[in-house]
């Protein structure tokens, strides 16, 4: 049955014969690797079942439930502070700027005293199998590793 047009003239209707060539999939999905307060899928923070496992999250609230919050800052009388762990702030800013889903790989907690590039490499290897991840973000690498170790990551 033909369509009823309101004005006279020539109308062209294109009928697609091929399926859509570009898939509708989200792009720019980041994979964050760094240190978290804890890594647990339930309220028992002693169990680290999410440690070194890529977890897909969709909000800051989900992140806080699985990985905790930012570390407490310790200010000195001079006004200096030592803030090595910036993953939480990076995630917070990601969602403050309209971020959607992302993947998190926790490679340890805030009690770490020594940092090795291998921990970050292990986290990156966990993200290799996830096709959705198109951006790699390692904010803690810049603050925890020595400059000479950054090149190896």
Regions found by a protein language model. Give the residues of each.
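Surface-exposed assembly/interface segments
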Residues: 1-153
